[in-house]
Amino acid sequence: MPIRDPEKLQLALEHHFKVKICRRCNARNPWNAERCRRCKSRDLRPKRYKK
């Protein structure tokens, strides 16, 4: 069931996509992370949003 309210949609997207993914071990990390919590790599990317 899609979310129609734009404020709730924005909140849900921010909650779901405001993470960083490690390119080495694919772990989810906090948005402000500089290193991976699992493998200590610095190779992080923001989670991609696919429409």
Curated annotation (Swiss-Prot):
Protein keywords: Ribonucleoprotein, Ribosomal protein
Disulfide bonds: none
GO biological process, one term: translation
Domain of life of the source: Archaea
GO molecular function list: structural constituent of ribosome
A single cellular component GO annotation: ribonucleoprotein complex
Transmembrane segments: none
SMART domains the record matches: Ribosomal_L40e
Pfam families recorded: Ribosomal_L40e
Family, as annotated: Belongs to the eukaryotic ribosomal protein eL40 family.
The protein's name: Large ribosomal subunit protein eL40
Organism: Thermofilum pendens (strain DSM 2475 / Hrk 5)
